[in-house]
């Protein structure tokens, strides 16, 4: 799950939360913050803590992300300002480390999370978000467009890697990045190209406001659960 840095609020006040949509698209790109699907048709403003639980959160920049209809529907209204800390969030935590995508299938990265946090708290928070969004395609009982699109992205990324192995030119690199940006599913592409640091670095640059503090110089997730400045805070 791509970690993002939205930056400070670009507006002082807005009357309706829908007015935050263009600001969010500019800040983090038109991708679902959770499943990473490209939001071509109907991007929706997502309230991390449900807007029905606290009117003060309805237009608050810190409570807003972008999401697809599938993730918003599955997430529901469970999260509040009180229990928000029971979950990891892509605009606050190292979700690049928290989840892995073997063969393009998302799962909680338990081994890495427990290495960073031996108490198991971070792993539980990641699992809570994973379960809340119903990201595991192996237990879904209903047709899930997120799964279909992710599988398509994995296939395209795999074919792109094969092309890269044959032709490692700057032109090919640029084409791969353009294809990834157009398709979405950042983490799937990062997984497929995990042994190609030149591609990983460019991928991080190409997807808007990806949180670079959570990646090393070769484009791989670092063993941190918070950004360095936050981790240093008592």
Model-derived features: positions:
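Short, charged surface segments at domain edges that flank catalytic/cofactor-binding sites
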Residues: 1-31, 53-62, 157-158, 177
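Amphipathic, alpha-helical segments enriched in basic
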Residues: 7-10, 20-23, 39, 43-46, ...
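Histidine-centered nuclease catalytic patch
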Residues: 34-66, 75-91, 95
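C-terminal, charged low-complexity interaction regions
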Residues: 124-234
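Domain-level detector of nuclease and nuclease-like folds
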Residues: 76-166
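Phosphate-binding glycine-rich loops and adjacent basic patches that engage nucleotide phosphates
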Residues: 25-33, 116-121
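DNA major-groove recognition helix of helix-turn-helix/homeodomain DNA-binding modules
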Residues: 71
């Amino acid at each position: 799950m791509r970690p993002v840095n939205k930056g400070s609020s670009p507006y002082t006040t807005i009357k309706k939360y829908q007015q935050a949509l263009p600001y969010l698209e500019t800040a983090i790109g038109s991708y679902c913050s959770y499943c990473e699907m490209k939001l071509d048709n109907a991007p929706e403003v997502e309230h991390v803590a449900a807007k029905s639980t606290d009117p003060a959160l309805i237009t608050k920049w810190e409570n807003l992300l972008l999401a697809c209809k599938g993730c918003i529907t599955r997430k529901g209204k469970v999260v509040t300002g009180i229990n928000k800390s029971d979950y990891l969030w892509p605009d606050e935590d190292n979700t690049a480390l928290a989840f892995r995508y073997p063969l393009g299938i998302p799962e909680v990265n338990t081994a890495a999370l427990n290495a960073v946090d031996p108490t198991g708290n971070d792993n539980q928070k990641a699992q809570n978000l994973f379960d809340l969004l119903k990201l595991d395609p192996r237990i879904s009982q209903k047709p899930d467009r997120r799964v279909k699109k992710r599988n398509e992205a994995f296939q395209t990324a795999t074919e792109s890697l094969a092309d890269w192995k044959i032709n490692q030119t700057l032109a090919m690199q640029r084409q791969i990045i353009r294809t990834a940006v157009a398709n979405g599913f950042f983490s799937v592409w990062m997984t497929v190209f995990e042994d190609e640091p030149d591609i990983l670095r460019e991928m991080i640059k190409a997807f808007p406001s990806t949180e670079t503090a959570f990646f090393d110089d070769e484009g791989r997730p670092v063993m941190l659960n918070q950004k360095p400045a936050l981790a240093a805070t008592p």
